[in-house]
């Protein structure tokens, strides 16, 4: 007997000839908020050579991935897109992920989200209704979806907030993440931001560099940004900057073995200052250089608010 979820085999021949899965097979499940960029994520993975199945109900995901993972399967990389348009979504996706892990087919769950006001604007732009709004408002539909997806997000391998990302930014973020999956390395994203615009929602931890003097108050530096050498030299030469950078990199190196043991291959560090133009940008760039030089991590840098007013 084979059931869609909670697969149970009572077939004697199956017991005598256990299924053989290919080595290093890592399936991907793409999910998240409607309007957050699931279709873009799917296209990126297709361009990277993944076989992508769209809008697959959770009860079918287990069977599809099991089939693709077998040694005799012609598909070596598979990703499935699963969203709340599937009536069976509620509660069942987390169950499927758990069952895949029990079968040693540990999936990478990519979860995309965005702020409510951003999602509302995106839906308004394309003149579409939300799949869960029914006869209610768009805001109600988004709130319902966030509640449904909360346990999925908590268990996700990679969470990307697309609120402030262009399509090209999202593509780069996904490409970087999935190169990491292919090579089995750990990846750290350093994201500079301005506290006045809010902290990154997908950061694992946040660093506040407002203890450093603000170049904004130096007239000749104000027009520049933290990626420019005059600002970078000013920020990094301030008292406490060198000590902070050394201590932070040392702390991260101490944490890496624990992260690796827990299977956490994606680490996001938010580095914040007031506006996200000067101090956080300069410190993020320098942190990225030092982490790349002193660890085996793949490193990428995102300056979320560098052009934001």
Curated annotation (Swiss-Prot):
Keyword flag ATP-binding: yes
Signal peptide range in chain numbering: none
MF term (GO), any: GTP binding
Domain of life, source organism: Bacteria
Residues given in the record as ATP binding sites: 32-39
Entry-linked Pfam families: PapZ_C (PF22740), RapZ-like_N (PF03668)
Family of the protein in this entry: Belongs to the RapZ-like family.
NCBIfam families, per the entry: PRK05416.1
Functional summary from the UniProt entry: Displays ATPase and GTPase activities.
Name of the protein in its database record: Nucleotide-binding protein Cgl1591/cg1794
Species: Corynebacterium glutamicum (strain ATCC 13032 / DSM 20300 / JCM 1318 / BCRC 11384 / CCUG 27702 / LMG 3730 / NBRC 12168 / NCIMB 10025 / NRRL B-2784 / 534)
């Amino acid at each position: 007997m084979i059931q869609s979820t909670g697969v149970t085999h009572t077939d004697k021949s199956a017991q005598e000839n256990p299924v053989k899965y290919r080595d290093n097979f890592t399936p991907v499940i793409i999910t998240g908020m409607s309007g957050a960029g699931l279709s873009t994520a799917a296209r990126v993975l297709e361009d990277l050579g993944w076989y992508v199945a769209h809008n697959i109900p959770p009860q079918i995901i287990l069977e599809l991935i099991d089939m693709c993972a077998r040694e005799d399967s012609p598909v070596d990389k598979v990703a499935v897109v699963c969203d709340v348009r599937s009536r069976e979504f509620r509660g069942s996706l987390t169950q499927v992920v758990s069952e895949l892990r029990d079968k040693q087919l540990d999936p990478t769950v990519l979860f995309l989200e965005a702020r409510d006001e951003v999602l509302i604007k995106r839906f308004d732009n394309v003149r579409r209704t939300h799949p869960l709004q029914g006869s209610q408002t768009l805001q109600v539909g988004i709130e319902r979806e966030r509640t449904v997806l909360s346990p999925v997000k908590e268990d996700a391998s990679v969470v990307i907030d697309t609120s402030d990302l262009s399509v090209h930014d999202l593509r780069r973020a996904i490409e970087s993440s999935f190169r990491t999956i292919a090579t089995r390395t750990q990846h750290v994203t350093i994201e500079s931001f301005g506290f006045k615009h809010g902290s990154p929602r997908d950061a694992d931890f946040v660093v506040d560099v407002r203890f450093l003097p603000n170049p904004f108050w130096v007239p000749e530096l104000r027009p520049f940004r933290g990626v420019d050498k005059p600002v970078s030299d000013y920020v990094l030469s301030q008292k406490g900057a060198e000590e902070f950078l050394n201590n932070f990199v040392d702390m991260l190196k101490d944490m890496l073995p624990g992260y690796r043991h827990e299977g956490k291959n994606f680490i996001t560090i938010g580095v914040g200052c007031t506006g996200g133009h000067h101090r956080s940008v300069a410190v993020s760039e320098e942190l990225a250089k030092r982490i790349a030089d002193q660890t085996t991590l793949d490193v990428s840098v995102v300056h979320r608010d560098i052009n934001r007013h």
